[in-house]
Amino acid sequence: MGSLYELTREELAASLTGEPRFRVEQLWRGLWREDRRVDEVTTLPTALRERLALEHPSSLTAINEVVSDGGATTKWVFALHDGATIETVLMAYEDRVTVCVSSQAGCAMGCSFCATGQAGFTRQLSVGEVIEQVVVAARAGAPRRLSNVVFMGMGEPLANYDVTVGVLRRLHEERRMSARHLTVSTVGVAPAIERLAREGLPLTLAVSLHSANDEVRNDLAPINRRYDLARLAAACSRWIKETGRRLSFEWALIDGVNDTERALDELAAYARPLAAHVNLIPLNPTPGYLVRGSTPERVRAFRDGLIARGVNATVRNTRGRSIDAACGQLASVTRGKPGLRRDGSTTTVALRTRPL
């Protein structure tokens, strides 16, 4: 049988046939409100806990856990029941605690600068496999409360649409997380954006844009050959109209590719009619894409240029680069030894070993 997090409340009740009805609420509270492992739900009899743990083992087995940024960023590599692997990242800020979850093992989108896309697609994740990433992160972040969940890990969330929406609804309804603190990132699956707009969830949508020029974007994000910038803009406009929510564009700044004055003008012209906020991300290094990221000076100049052109823009505070946990770096492999960079130089990374 699968993880308990695969089950709805009704399915959970069915698994407790023969038990008093109040056991369902005790178990549900332990799992969804208190983030406990089933063996830790001490309101249940020991024999029942042992049976449930045996029948519904965890979906995730941690095979590596590394910490950076002075303990503020944690990355896990998890093995799934069939040997597929995924990565999850927990980031603690002064004002929030965020987990970045994977929605697929690998990714079929093939974005040239993304380590996940370079690695290829393995399979879709299930609802329970995604939710357990959230629960593991919530336990690790305690006593601080997990406040935000972002679908910015491995995979294209809207290519695993039903699971993504199922997870969003359960986080909102069962964990009582504000939908505004749930973010879905997409490379631009236009029909799915329009479908998501009709779900009635006032979540945050982040579009990985990276170029407002079809020719350039075709190379950076091959999905653009199927849904070009005009089609994507129409979907974004529908999103805004249906939800009343602002959207954001993610833009990984690549030296000489999308940090030029022309790229600046193209982005401003594209973002302004949609009143989109632009998150600028200095390109993070990956083994399969050897072009450099923009210099800090160019990043600041690009941001200032957008603001001068009437576009809201900020530079993302990059976390986890030293442990390959930053945007575009997730590839579900343990590269080198913990505590070392790929080139052998030391970094402030420490292994943790604690039960999940």
Where are the predicted features?
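Canonical Radical SAM [4Fe-4S] cluster-binding loop centered on the CxxxCxxC motif
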Residues: 92-129
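Conserved alpha-helical substructure of the radical SAM core
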Residues: 118-148
